[in-house]
Amino acid sequence: QTSRASYSDRWVVLEGEGEGHGDFRTADRAIRYLRDNKDKPFFLAVGFVKPHSPPSAPKRFYDLWDVDSIPLPPNFAPRPTVPEGFPKAAIRPRNADLFMGRDASETEAREMIRAYLASTAWMDWNTGRVLAELDKLGLREKTIVVFWGDHGYQLGERGKWSKAGSLFEQGTRTPLIFIVPGVTPAGKRSPRVVEAIDIYPTLAELCGLAPPVGVEGRSLAPLLKEPDAEWDRPAFTVWSEDGRTFHGVGVRTERWRYTEFGVNGVNGSMLFDLNADPHELKNLADDPQHADVQKELSVQVRKYAARISAAGPATNP
């Protein structure tokens, strides 16, 4: 019997263009759907598994990178490590995916990072196959396209791998791209902080629909038209081990990331100035020079935690 650790702690080189993998077939099904529904309104959600572990891609995508030239993150560690000045609760002591229960050497880390990059590039290629079909069918100029990832990915920062077990930028920031014909300026980026729950009300507004009462989130339509438009909402992230209680709750503004562990930060807190410290190397929590910032963000975190606690545990429909 193969253990989860031995199964996950590897990467896969797919044969050919990856035709035997589910993600390739997902793109094929999406293409068939577009062909079958090109003459009527449609909604199509295309979900690719990769680059979830084990990272997988055809050989030519691995060959895009020289493994010896791949840089390690500035805070790389062989195994999950709580840096000095950080609360112990900030990092789960065991990886849940890659390098489970053992150290990752620098060579192994570079090889795994290359595999992740290759897997991401292959996912991008499969996405391109679907978009190319939109062009072929003449649908691009009347189709809204949203590219979104549901979580970030740690690649050896503080010894962490994959998505879970911390609330740092690397694991919580996600890609989000909107293409709205006649609305979005090509190639523009917005510095505003938004949340995944904003996607649904955005699509509803763009389609001229009223979102159901009680739907959380806020339409991003103003930012799609003007990426630098005023925006006063931060993003929140929750770490829960059981789906009922909070291990940690964090808030992200354009400049700051602040996290409290345990009820009202009883197990410690973290504050980072992401403008000056994008890799989150120095914890500014409890620094007197940043007391006002921490106090303001702590109020936001605790209000958010109280609100979602009152709402009860999240459940899948």
Where are these regions (language model features)?
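Active-site-proximal cap/lid insertion segments
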Residues: Q1-D28, R32-V193, L206-G214, E260-G265, ...
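C-terminal cap/loop subdomain of S1 sulfatases and analogous C-terminal strand-loop tails that border
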Residues: A27, H151-E157, T184, E195-Y200, ...
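A generic structural signal for nonpolar/aromatic side chains embedded in well-ordered alpha-helices
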Residues: V46, W65, L223-L224, V251, ...
